[in-house]
Amino acid sequence: MKYILFILLLFISCSKNSESNSSNEDESLASETEQLSNDYYEIYLLEQLNENRGYCIDIKGSKLNADPDNGLQAHTCYSYQGEVSVDQGFDNVKIDDDEFYMPFFDVCMEAENTSASSTLKLRGCNKNEKQKFKFNNNAEIVLNDNTNLCLTVSENSREGGGGTPTHLIRDLTLDNCSTDISSRQKWGLRKAQ
């Protein structure tokens, strides 16, 4: 009986330590994520269009649970919440080197192809031509391989899955740079608002 009681107490003690360690690990990850997000910059559309919180380049999914395999979209900027979210966070130093790098997910923005209407995906950074973009003097993000193609948000928006009021989403493509649609092709770079 003493042996069974000892085993039971040992099991309970280990379970409590495991829960405590798990909780500490979760808190540590949250703290690291918060610190990292303070170093991120968001890329936002200069025109708010129909979203007063603005549109930012965003990984499809939700913050830490975003999946880079799902590609990029324009989504309500999260900076109104006080910080740049990891799924909208870019390394501004790498942007100066024509690389749109998202450090939390260790991926770079990449064009599906180098023609109009190309979609954007995320891949491991390897400096291939489809990953080289320039933030030009006209506030456009253009593909180095075809500077006539601008990063463009779609004309129509749809509701996302969260937020109050509900967040909005628009598709992102590379389209011919044009003054007719410049309100959907001009971008800025900032830390949290």
Give residue spans per PLM region.
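Extracellular glycan-recognition/adhesion modules and their associated mucin-like linkers
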Residues: 21-68, 83-115, 130-160, 181-193
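Disulfide-bonded cysteine motifs in exported proteins
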Residues: 9, 51, 71-72, 103, ...
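N-terminal Sec signal peptide cleavage junction
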Residues: 14-16
